[in-house]
Amino acid sequence: MNFKNTFFWFTALLSLLLDHLTKLWVVKNFALTVPPQTIPLWPGVFHLTYVTNTGAAFSLFSQGGEWLRWLSLGVSVGLMALAILGPNFNRWEQAGYGFLLGGAAGNGIDRFVAGRVVDFLDFRLIGFPIFNLADVFINIGIICLLIAAWGPLPSRRRAERRPSSPPPSDKLP
């Protein structure tokens, strides 16, 4: 049996593992308090702050976001089916879909197990909502898929369009 899209599976498992381990570390080492416990890594710019979120990114749908667990499950199953039943993807596509799966599964597991997602990355410089590695991986996945959709870089496309030189001739003029 030929196992295809191996980079997809590697990316998905690695991103899921990193997301899970960082959330586990936060839960074990921080108290869930009001106001939230925070550790400034770069004061005023970047902190680790333990909060939970029952909604989606930026706390959207935090009221009645029960359906988000099923959306996470559906996206995860769909991406796995695509990797198994679909074509062999290029590296950018495999990375993109893998990061999407890792992020969707990471937040989905939180939603099924605890009913909420653990967030802890607090970028305060621009007042950004607190997020987690799963959110980062989902965004990286989207960027990878955009790169894949745009195809080769323009310089590479020009080289591919350039007509090849005729083969050298044995006859001299």
Swiss-Prot record:
InterPro entries: Peptidase_A8. Keywords: Aspartyl protease, Cell inner membrane, Cell membrane, Hydrolase, Membrane, Protease, Transmembrane, Transmembrane helix. The active site is at D119, D135. Its main location: membrane. It catalyses: Release of signal peptides from bacterial membrane prolipoproteins. Hydrolyzes -Xaa-Yaa-Zaa-|-(S,diacylglyceryl)Cys-, in which Xaa is hydrophobic (preferably Leu), and Yaa (Ala or Ser) and Zaa (Gly or Ala) have small, neutral side chains. It is an enzyme of class 3 (hydrolase). This protein specifically catalyzes the removal of signal peptides from prolipoproteins. This is Lipoprotein signal peptidase. It comes from Cyanothece sp. (strain PCC 7425 / ATCC 29141). The gene is lspA.
